[in-house]
Regions:
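Class I S-adenosyl-L-methionine-dependent methyltransferase catalytic core
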Residues: 1-91, 95-241
């Protein structure tokens, strides 16, 4: 399998990503177990569709083990109107280039979803589902040729994303932030200010989506906000309710 290596500038300078002729990655059972440990209480009574998975998929095998109500397919999901109508929730590790298409269909059909996605695809998801939640996953995947992928676009940042909101509420985040623009930019979610002293609006890291709070509304994803003329990493604009 031929590979081409490119290097991004800006905030990703020095980080290399692999572009290969297939963006398929197979999910190991350890990753599937981690996902279901987060979402099982929310999906165990629902009809689940695995749209990018054959009978040997770790998702399918684990769903069998749990006795879940599921269907799977490995053909073109755009042509499976029957399964879109049947299911309550879509769970898969989709080809990453197909994530925007799948998101558009899920939004149109008003279905819940749980995806595996790299950081570079989070913007496409959060633009369509602003209130999506996510959690970290093991950084290990298999290529179709059965080799292991530990570095590159998959492993750099691997997240499980869901609009099913399986994450606990986190009301008391305590943080510090830069106040160098009209809208402060928070650099570390671990130092989130208490609500009573927080500004009305803030740019926060996308890891804010790992927590739920009743007092903040998500407004939009900002690709590269600036502080003193310097680009920062992608941020989420939030506002007090």
């Amino acid at each position: 399998m031929e590979t081409e290596t490119k290097q991004f500038g800006g905030g990703l300078k020095g980080v290399r990503y692999k572009y290969i002729d297939s963006d398929e990655y197979y999910t190991p059972i350890e990753t599937v177990e981690k996902i279901f440990s987060k979402i099982l209480p929310h999906v165990k009574e629902k009809k689940i569709w695995f749209p990018c998975d054959n009978e040997q998929s770790a998702f399918v095998l684990y769903a069998q083990k749990l006795g879940l109500n599921y269907k799977n397919s490995s053909d073109d999901f755009r042509k499976r109107e029957d399964l879109f109508l049947w299911c309550d929730v879509v769970i898969t590790n989709p080809p990453f280039t197909k994530i925007p298409i799948l998101c558009d269909l899920i939004k149109e059909k008003k279905k819940d979803f749980v995806f595996i996605a790299p950081y570079v695809r989070m913007n496409a998801i959060m633009q369509r589902f602003l209130n999506v939640s996510f959690f970290y996953l093991p950084r290990l995947f298999y290529r179709p040729d059965n080799t292991i992928e530990r570095i590159g676009v998959v492993a750099a940042n691997s997240f499980g994303l869901t609009n099913n909101n399986p994450l606990p509420q986190h009301e008391k985040l305590i943080c510090e932030y830069e106040d160098e623009t009209r809208i402060p930019i928070l650099n570390n979610i671990k130092f989130f200010p208490q609500d009573e002293i927080a500004p009305n609006k803030m740019y926060v890291p996308l890891t804010f989506a790992m927590y739920e709070t009743k007092n903040w509304q998500r407004i939009r994803v900002q690709d590269r906000p600036k502080v003193n003329g310097k680009d920062k990493f992608r941020r989420l604009l939030i506002q007090k309710k």
